[in-house]
Structures are given as structure tokens and as C-alpha cells.
Amino acid sequence: MYKFKRSFRRRLSPIGSGNLIYYRNMSLISRFISEQGKILSRRVNRLTLKQQRLITIAIKQARILSLLPFINNEKQFERIESITRVKGFIKK
């Protein structure tokens, strides 16, 4: 029996060699945060373990220094406002 070799293509990291993982680099950090403001997992980010650790530390530092919100509730407030508007129209 013959064993076929599967071709394995290594995926490029979303963080280039020129990008600095730093809490002030908001354009880089914002790519690794969900819409709710949560840190995305390593599988979703496709980062190495070391890069994920550095990103996590940078995000936490940015949150503590108020550069990033801990939780992003903007969409939740929009939904509540639209529900109250609909209820107001029904009463009248």
C-alpha cells in the first residue's frame, strides 16, 4: 500500500514582522477583539502562543489605561431604544 503525502501549506500570521504588539497600537489590537469587546481565541486569530500572550497583555493594558472599553454595549442600547419607541407608538 502506498501512503500519499498530504501537502501542508503553512498559513501566514496576521501579525507581520513589522507590526509592534503594544498597547498603544490600536489598529492592530482592534483586529483581535470581538464586537462585544472580548478577546478572540487563538484558533480564531490564527496566532502563535507567544503572539496571543502578547496581544492579551496589550489588550488588558489598554483596558486599564481606558484606551479600550472592558465591555462594548453600544448595540444593546440601540436595541433597547428601538423597543421603547415601538411600545410608545402602541400606547398612543
Curated annotation (Swiss-Prot):
One of its GO terms (biological process) is translation. It is found in: Plastid. SUPFAM superfamilies: Ribosomal protein S18. GO terms for cellular component: mitochondrial small ribosomal subunit; plastid. The keyword Mitochondrion does not apply. InterPro entries: Ribosomal_bS18, Ribosomal_bS18_CS, Ribosomal_bS18_sf. Gene3D superfamilies: Ribosomal protein S18 (4.10.640.10). Pfam families: Ribosomal_S18 (PF01084). One of its GO terms (molecular function) is structural constituent of ribosome. Keywords: Plastid, Ribonucleoprotein, Ribosomal protein, RNA-binding, rRNA-binding. Signal peptide: none annotated. Part of the 30S ribosomal subunit. Belongs to the bacterial ribosomal protein bS18 family. This is Small ribosomal subunit protein bS18c.
